[in-house]
Amino acid sequence: MTALTQAHCEACRADAPHVSDEELPVLLRQIPDWNIEVRDGIMQLEKVYLFKNFKHALAFTNAVGEISEAEGHHPGLLTEWGKVTVTWWSHSIKGLHRNDFIMAARTDEVAKTAEGRK
C-alpha cells in the first residue's frame, strides 16, 4: 500500500495544475507497470490487466467503476475477453493531475484481490 492509495481525489477544474515535470517521475515510481500514452496531445496513464476469462474481466471493470464513483473520478475502460485496459487522465485539464496517480494506485489495489487474474 502506498501513500497514493490512502489519498483522496480533489475537485479538478480547468485551471487546476498539471503534474509537473519534477513530480512525474516521483509519482510514476509509485505505480509500477503503468505507461504514459499520449493521444491527441493529451498525456494519459494506461495499464492492461489480464484475466482468465471475460467474466473475471467484467467483474474487475465493475470494481474499478465502484472506486471511481466513490472518488468522482472516472477512467477510460476497455473490457475484452481476458483483458481490461484502464486509462486515467483528467478531462478538465486535458492531461495528468495527481488524481490520476491516486486512482491508478487504487486500481492496482483492486487488482491485487481480483478473481481470475493471470
Curated annotation (Swiss-Prot):
Entry superkingdom: Bacteria
Gene3D superfamilies associated with the record: Transcriptional coactivator/pterin dehydratase
EC number: 4.2.1.96
Gene Ontology molecular function: 4-alpha-hydroxytetrahydrobiopterin dehydratase activity
Signal peptide per UniProt: none
Keywords attached to this entry: Lyase, Tetrahydrobiopterin biosynthesis
Record bears the keyword Lyase: yes
UniProt key word Lyase: yes
Known role: Involved in tetrahydrobiopterin biosynthesis. Seems to both prevent the formation of 7-pterins and accelerate the formation of quinonoid-BH2. May also have a positive regulatory role in the expression of phhA.
HAMAP family according to UniProt: Pterin_4_alpha
Family of this protein: Belongs to the pterin-4-alpha-carbinolamine dehydratase family.
PANTHER family in the record: PTERIN-4-ALPHA-CARBINOLAMINE DEHYDRATASE-RELATED (PTHR42805:SF1)
Protein name according to UniProt: Pterin-4-alpha-carbinolamine dehydratase
Organism in which the protein naturally occurs: Pseudomonas aeruginosa (strain ATCC 15692 / DSM 22644 / CIP 104116 / JCM 14847 / LMG 12228 / 1C / PRS 101 / PAO1)
Taxonomy of the source species: Bacteria, Pseudomonadati, Pseudomonadota, Gammaproteobacteria, Pseudomonadales
